[in-house]
Amino acid sequence: MLHPVVAFGKMISFSEHLLNKGQNRKLKGALAAIVLVLAIYFVASYLFRWVASSSPGGFLTLQILAIFFCLAGTTLVREVRMVFEAVDRSLEEGRKQVARIVGRDTSELSAQEVRTAALETLAENLSDGVIAPLFWYILLGVPGMLAYKMVNTLDSMIGYRNERYRDFGCFAARLDDVANYIPARLTAFLMILAFPRGGFWNLLKFVGMYGNQHASPNSGYPEAALAGILNCRFGGPHNYFGEEVWKPYIGSNGRLLTTEDMKIAVSVNRRAEGIMIIILIITITLVSFFI
């Protein structure tokens, strides 16, 4: 069975190959993104209505499969664990392992930078890989969740500021920012609620202070929540394949990160996911009761 995200990737690649040329690339990119997202939403809506009317059991099975395919939490947790295990063995192994989950040059990273990159990615993934899909499922059902995954896949494939995608992927990147605006902040809140080490209100203030320091309008919030919980510092200079990019620091304690920090970060993720699932179950129960 073809994974939906793989299918989305093929659709995006086809659209990009067809349209990312000549004049009006911004307009073409915007139209491609809008058509793809709306197509996924309406096709999924029609399909699920048809299945629900003909086979309630099949409808439930299809919903479960869609949710399973749209969530991306377990795989990254495993990868982050492997990064910490690898860097404990050797710096070179750690660099190679973290390269699997980050989009930057890892060949010159220090051990601290390897661990930092892994934890930053873990925090970001909790938002766009777990909390955001469930958020859109609560709002718009499986079609909304699938449409969100298309938005997220568009951003990951063409939402770059390089020469090839600067114009064509501009709208996709902004659309992803909008789709993740509430989920990113909700993720930070759930992380603090799940693991209020250092004090719930202190952590909220910390996120309020550092959450908007990131270049992304959204990624800084879950990163700030994790940095506050761990009492550490994220951000700083990064090498993106020959180009040095400075990311503002999130937090002020530049202490060395350890395997224990990774274990706490994983626990934070799992607890936040659990709270979101409880919210989902309560919402479904209330909707079923009143409809």
Regions found by a protein language model. Give the residues of each.
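Active-site His/Glu-centered metal-binding helix of metallohydrolases
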Residues: 150, 154, 158
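Hydrophobic alpha-helical transmembrane segments
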Residues: 1-146, 159-291
